[in-house]
């Protein structure tokens, strides 16, 4: 028989974080919640109190009153494929596009991409997206490709291919998310025990970070604001909570598949890259008659970051001096090849720090990254998933 009454309180390993998308801000949807993998969380509520500066002859401060009640949301994570797609989409104000799901034995490889004799087979593919191709006998035709042009019967890619007749069973897949204007909020719950829950309605994500560093797996965090924190004794999910994806976390070795700048591989050795997404100006809205938030200001999407390389030449430094906007993109995948291509179509390198930190050390160059809306594409960041 197992021993009982051994614990002084709730253990962190028993805490489950789950969520559902809201149709109406702050209102719990009648759907199954989804569990989230996480390495730490910081969901919490707080009250703002104020007291008048009254002049009193008893030399005591006047009692305080509650003026606002707030709640904050936070998740730290190790990046794994598919786990945070909803949260990332909410942060960027958009949805991933309908997945490209093309397959068949009627797809041929060409020196510049792919062709088919089947009319309309490639109509779901558009210029600019990244796709994952598999099934060809020639390895040059498989892998991750950036589409530069597409029609119903042909796809042109930035990466060279090889002439290969149709015949093998080939699959082409991908889905794209860009920053948009849609507002998406979530209903989160923190399960502490079978009858102990904390609930965070109206959660709106206002910031996120993804970091790759030598010797580490991909890490990240999301931060946001919630309408209020309240307690509950029952599960808010309609039915059982859906389990989180179980894929392996993305590592910084095979899981990092190169950084491109201006559509060419960066020749320098990369030591680390960080991207920060923020909704500047996002805030809860308050009014008379209630301490709780009455609405949300969405803010505007900004993308910043940094990249650190082993210094060897002035190739990137020259773009900093000229303030030339370039396309930046990198890919991260798990051991099954599932993952993301993260792209800034109009990025600037700024404020490099090229320093000799001490004897016997590598000279590193750290550049700040600044994303801007692309003049013709109209977005600041794109995330393709495979």
Predicted features along the sequence, with ranges:
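Signature of extracytoplasmic/envelope-associated structural regions
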Residues: 1-386
């Amino acid at each position: 028989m197992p021993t009982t009454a051994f614990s002084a309180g709730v253990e962190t390993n028993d805490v489950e974080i789950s969520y559902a998308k809201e149709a109406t801000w702050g209102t719990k949807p009648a759907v199954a919640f989804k569990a989230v993998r996480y390495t730490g969380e910081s969901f919490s509520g707080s009250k703002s109190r104020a007291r008048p500066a009254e002049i009193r002859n008893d030399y005591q401060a006047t009692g305080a009153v509650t003026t606002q009640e707030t709640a904050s949301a936070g998740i730290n994570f190790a990046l794994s494929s598919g786990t945070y797609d909803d949260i990332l989409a909410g942060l960027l104000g958009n949805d991933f596009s309908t997945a490209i799901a093309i397959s068949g034995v009627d797809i041929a490889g060409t020196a510049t991409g792919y062709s088919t004799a089947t009319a309309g087979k490639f109509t779901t593919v558009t210029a600019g997206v990244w796709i994952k191709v598999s099934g060809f006998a020639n390895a040059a035709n498989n892998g991750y490709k950036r589409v530069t042009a597409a029609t119903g019967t042909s796809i042109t890619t930035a990466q060279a291919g090889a002439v290969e007749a149709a015949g093998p069973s080939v699959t082409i897949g991908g889905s794209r998310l860009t920053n948009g204007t849609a507002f998406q909020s979530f209903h989160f719950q923190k399960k502490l025990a079978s009858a102990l829950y904390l609930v965070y309605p109206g959660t709106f994500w206002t910031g996120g970070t993804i970091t790759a560093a030598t010797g580490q797996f991909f890490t990240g965090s999301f931060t946001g604001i919630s309408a209020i924190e309240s307690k509950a004794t029952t599960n808010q999910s309609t039915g059982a909570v859906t389990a989180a994806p179980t894929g392996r976390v993305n590592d910084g070795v095979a899981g990092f598949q190169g950084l491109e700048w201006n559509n060419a591989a960066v020749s320098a050795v990369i030591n680390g890259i960080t991207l920060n997404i923020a909704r500047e100006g996002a805030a809860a809205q308050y009014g008379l008659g209630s301490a709780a938030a009455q609405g949300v200001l969405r803010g505007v999407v900004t993308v910043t970051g940094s990249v650190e390389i082993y210094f060897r030449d002035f190739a990137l430094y020259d773009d900093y001096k000229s303030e030339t906007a370039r396309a930046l993109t990198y890919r991260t995948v798990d051991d099954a090849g599932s993952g993301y291509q993260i792209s800034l179509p109009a990025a600037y390198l700024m404020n490099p720090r090229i320093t000799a930190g001490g004897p016997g050390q590598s000279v590193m160059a750290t550049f700040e990254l600044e994303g801007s809306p692309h003049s013709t594409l109209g977005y600041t960041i794109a995330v393709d998933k495979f």
